[in-house]
């Protein structure tokens, strides 16, 4: 597992003040900051997962979702993750070929197939989770325990708001 550092923009020959200003003075301040943090959190981990396990983002997201919910359709996974349906469909085919998922007809909707994770898929998921936990800690270490609880409450509220 590689250690990913949150490098200062000054190391890339940028004026730190200008860099900080973009986070404070723009017309979509919260959106930009959330996007920045999300990218800093997940992109390095997905690069590591691709290098170490040969999995693309959609493929791992299938494992993640099916590790927590026993049966899902590809559309369910696309809806839960915000990933495009076509990237999830490609991921389903690859994960079926590699033996990480099984597929069966959906008795409620003949056009859909129900996906389940195999024991091999569960094991792969268990191997990958620590990579995310390490990266999460690298990002969240700037917060004390009260701030982490507050962040957790705020994120739960935003995710639960059912915003389109």
Language-model segments: which ranges?
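Charged, amphipathic alpha-helical coiled-coil/dimerization segments
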Residues: 9-17, 93-153
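Alpha-helical transmembrane segments and membrane-interface helix-loop junctions
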Residues: 74, 160-164
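DNA-binding alpha-helical recognition surfaces that contact promoter or target DNA
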Residues: 64, 90, 153
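Pre-recognition alpha-helix immediately N-terminal to the DNA-recognition helix
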Residues: 33, 44, 61-64, 123, ...
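N-terminal leader segment of winged-helix/HTH proteins
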Residues: 1-53
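Short, locally clustered residues in the helix-turn-helix/winged-helix DNA-binding domain
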Residues: 39, 64-68, 129, 156
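N-terminal helix-turn-helix DNA-binding core of bacterial DNA-binding proteins
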Residues: 25, 42-87
């Amino acid at each position: 597992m590689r250690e990913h550092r949150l490098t200062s923009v000054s190391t890339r020959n940028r004026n730190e003040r200008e860099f900080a200003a973009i986070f404070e003075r723009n017309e979509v301040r919260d959106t930009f900051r959330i996007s920045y943090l999300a990218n800093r959190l997940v992109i390095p981990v997905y690069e590591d997962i691709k290098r170490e396990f040969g999995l693309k983002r959609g493929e791992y997201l299938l494992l993640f979702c099916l590790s927590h919910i026993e049966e899902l359709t590809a559309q369910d996974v696309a809806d839960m993750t915000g990933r495009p349906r076509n990237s999830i469909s490609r991921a389903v085919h690859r994960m079926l070929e590699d033996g990480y998922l099984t597929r069966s007809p959906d008795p409620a909707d003949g056009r859909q197939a129900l996906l389940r994770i195999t024991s091999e898929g569960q094991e792969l998921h268990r191997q990958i989770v620590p990579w995310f936990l390490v990266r999460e800690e690298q990002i969240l270490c700037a917060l004390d325990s009260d701030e982490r609880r507050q962040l957790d409450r705020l994120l739960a509220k935003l995710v639960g708001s059912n915003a389109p």
